[in-house]
Curated annotation (Swiss-Prot):
A single GO BP: L-histidine biosynthetic process
Annotated Gene3D superfamilies: MazG-like
Enzyme class, UniProt record, top EC level: hydrolase
SUPFAM superfamilies found in the cross-reference section: all-alpha NTP pyrophosphatases
Biochemical pathway: Amino-acid biosynthesis; L-histidine biosynthesis; L-histidine from 5-phospho-alpha-D-ribose 1-diphosphate: step 2/9
Subcellular location: Cytoplasm
Keyword ATP-binding: yes
Superkingdom field: Bacteria
Any one GO MF annotation of this record: ATP binding
Species classification: Bacteria, Bacillati, Bacillota, Bacilli, Bacillales
Protein's recorded name: Phosphoribosyl-ATP pyrophosphatase
Length: 107
């Protein structure tokens, strides 16, 4: 799975460095961070709706859209995927207790 993410991120970086006409990825880069963030928000809302509808297939599709748009944001912000993966690996296996988390009381 990690290879699929690496390949997707590499493609996004290539689009950023060498834009292709009619590329949706290039469209997002040309519109900038606000557009990318808006798309992430939209896709997250679609994940929520798919979950509420108990539509597993749609959840999977929408999660891929979330990952894609988050990867575009990472590339826009010049954050390497390896940095994110390193953080995931560092957190993997760590015991986290509910008491260690801040209370979520407002949105």
């Amino acid at each position: 799975m990690e290879n699929a993410f690496k390949l997707l991120y590499k493609t996004i970086e290539e689009r950023k460095e060498s834009p292709l006409p009619e590329s949706y990825t290039n469209y997002l880069f040309s519109k900038g961070e606000d557009k990318i963030l808006k798309k992430i928000g939209e896709e997250c809302a679609e994940v929520i709706i798919a979950c509420k509808n108990n539509d597993k297939e749609e959840v999977v599709k929408e999660m891929v859209d979330v990952f894609y748009h988050c990867f575009v944001l990472l590339a826009e912000k010049n954050i390497a995927l390896e940095d994110v993966m390193r953080e995931v690996k560092e957190r993997n296996g760590k015991l986290s207790r509910v008491g260690d988390r801040r209370e979520i009381d407002t949105l």
